[in-house]
């Protein structure tokens, strides 16, 4: 069927901010869909609240709305734009649930909008647990015994039917949110109540436990002529009980018999037909009982998902692009496969002759109080993917690509394992607990002498995978005993098992450099193979490569398929797996670098190992290497690329800390670095050198010191005086950073921090309390400087910049203060000889007085996480311009002007606290947010100043982050001593808006002295009914709670946690409270209007 001509405009709903379970993969799918449908001539309207995405760039869709993704706001966009169709399958659970709400409330019918890609009844049938189960029964496919329940009483009846342990799965939630495994009745009740609360339809499925079963997924694409293909089979190495997003997975499935595979293939196609998915990709999940082969269907996603991003990158088959075109009427046989240059149609099922391994990355260390346990609710924040010719090569590449300091199956300590009497029991106990380290625990168990059968009994991993790991451990023993192989054949055999030079160095008590020299002396180097989706059957025209050391049965080395070009080229190093502090913002910059190089005729070569991202899409750059970002892997691909053509250099300043760590190794190897020199980057990171630079420029810094021993740290701390901030040098995302307020806190920090040394000193900075923090992003070519953005933080200094809301332009700073910040930024950029991007963080004491004091906190001569937000606000492709400057263009040639604009943008951080029980939500100097949203609004006619526009933009940023500010009700206000003067105005604003205000004794007395009367409520420790009781009874709609000091934090912990669980908006800084009060007073939700991004740029 040719494409539909009865529709001309299509609305695509994005996924919103990056949260656990919904990350960059939806930027990747959204970009593919927009590009594919625009190429077909449709007008594309896009809504997404996340500014750090490529899809929200003004040239990706025809009308781009950076607005909150709520049914009310999307309805306003529909009313304004009148699209013919809505495609809800590209934006994860957020888009599906929003589309269903618009269908249910009659918006789609009212404006004549047709849902394409998946109809409402299809989504409902797939996502509603009971309807899905009924559909499986109809097909004669088994699913686990289960009951759908809408109340706790119904769930208790369901429990009698399924027994304990039981799995609880809420309907219509993302990545297992609210679900879990209950081993006893108390846990069961707790999980069911939470699940019912978090499910938008108040429904949970109580399901028999299939813990320990093998888990598989099938990625299926179907068109309206009923052509179906399996793009990829995926096997979870972790057994059932661990969410598939937290599981280590391999593609293709490696341990299915052909009979089982064919059964699963037929079953997944039958599932799509029965559910009614007519156009597009879906994934179907199965569980297999290893004891008797019983096979059951677990669930399906009727949309593009995290697994489909993995399947796309694993095979080279662009699922999202194909799904988008199927949604407008094409059939699979009418579409060409890009990877083979159109030699095969899209109906040609991909086949692969390599093994892909995905390992998730976790951030439990960022959430003190959370247990690093894996369950059916997803907790990982990122993932790495690696490709090898064998499972061993693939899994070892993935382990080093995680960037958690591993070089392979590094040793891990198991508590009690060395006990001569009970050591074996300790190892078996450790194997039974699903943690992020379980793969290494398995390897360690083999080192302790356990057999494959014993390990299998303890952790339910498939014996085939266990034998592979046992072989790796055995080989490590041989290397330890006999040293490095002396022949090329022997060395190649080792490298073909995936051993990194760094791991071999550890095993032989040598250095990585020495191992590399020995390997290269024997001329043992990897070859590069192409991902072609057809296992070499047709010629691949797309340069999408991975490395391997594989060799033939007779020792012959396979042909290298890299085929580097003779062009002028530049290599962009990506950011690797997502983590807190380094995420999609950096991928955004890497993509822009590739686009910019393309525009100036330089070949772009991308290196990255994150399967979720746009940067690892085969058509983002000219050439793509899917490789771990380690010195060894990068130097090997550069060796091949430099054999032909001219390498202009490597770009290291766009991928966050990951590529910067490689800059020195590259420089030593004689590889040119584009942009700011590694020495200048070092100068900005090196405390003492940077201080000299600032002194020379007469720029102030908070009093600070550097300590190389704990005694020195204590002495320096006493000199600076409390409070001060302590942190290790060279970190991203505020890792290990803490505000120290007394000697006790200092000793606690020292006890938990480990060793410090000459190489790894500790930094101390005087903490500027009540200072306003400001971020400045600038472009520099060594001669001229353009200040792209000045962002005023809403939370005061002391909250990590990545976790603070901020406003651009500044909402309260004086014009002369902003000018002074720009002047100092220009001075530093020129002094550091920056070429490309630079970010400065300032703190301003008494910013509103006649004499504000400006201090520089830090300078980063690289891309910062605010770059995409700044680019969207000023309508300039900041990252792309930076890339062109690095390639030699002058800043002056872009004609950038600092022009005032009549709109205001607010960036707000989004946190995953709800997924980590027992974690305090108070903000501090260590970054804990996973993503961000942008609220954008403009000055209306007749408004004086930006105040009203700021209130609306702030309200939108809260709404986009999932916080709906109340318009009436009761607010609870309790603040620390130093904040009391700053809480009077927010309370007055709330009372004027009709709110009742409750306060604890101290805050109430202070407000009364200022002539503001509020009602008293007891603290938790003062007897009942106390504030938490009132909150649990639904008596509070808004919380302002600020604290300091260990005891006060502990006392008020329950208030913040209850607010989170009851979905009550809460603010833990006085500045955040003021912004919220202004938004409530000045911007009720119905007053919010929508406007496309393109119209702001045209101002």
UniProtKB/Swiss-Prot annotation:
Region Carbamoyl phosphate synthetic domain: start-end pairs: 563-962
Residues that bind ATP 2: 727, 766, 768, 773, 798-801, 841, 858
Residues reported in the UniProt entry to bind Mn(2+) 4: 858, 860
One cellular-component annotation, GO: cytoplasm
Cofactor(s) the record lists: Mg(2+); Mn(2+)
Residues holding Mn(2+) 1: 285, 299
Binding site for Mg(2+) 4: 858, 860
Record-annotated disulphide pairs: none
Span of domain ATP-grasp: 133-328, 691-887
GO process annotations (BP): 'de novo' UMP biosynthetic process; glutamine metabolic process; L-arginine biosynthetic process
InterPro entries: ATP-grasp, ATP_grasp_subdomain_1, CarbamoylP_synth_lsu, CarbamoylP_synth_lsu_oligo, CarbamoylP_synth_lsu_oligo_sf, CbamoylP_synth_lsu-like_ATP-bd, CbamoylP_synth_lsu_CPSase_dom, MGS-like_dom
Binding annotation for Mn(2+) 2: 299, 301
Sites where the protein binds Mn(2+) 3: 841, 858
Annotated domain remarks: The large subunit is composed of 2 ATP-grasp domains that are involved in binding the 2 ATP molecules needed for carbamoyl phosphate synthesis. The N-terminal ATP-grasp domain (referred to as the carboxyphosphate synthetic component) catalyzes the ATP-dependent phosphorylation of hydrogencarbonate to carboxyphosphate and the subsequent nucleophilic attack by ammonia to form a carbamate intermediate.
Function: Large subunit of the glutamine-dependent carbamoyl phosphate synthetase (CPSase). CPSase catalyzes the formation of carbamoyl phosphate from the ammonia moiety of glutamine, carbonate, and phosphate donated by ATP, constituting the first step of 2 biosynthetic pathways, one leading to arginine and/or urea and the other to pyrimidine nucleotides.
Record text on subunit structure and interactions: Composed of two chains; the small (or glutamine) chain promotes the hydrolysis of glutamine to ammonia, which is used by the large (or ammonia) chain to synthesize carbamoyl phosphate. Tetramer of heterodimers (alpha,beta)4.
Protein name: Carbamoyl phosphate synthase large chain
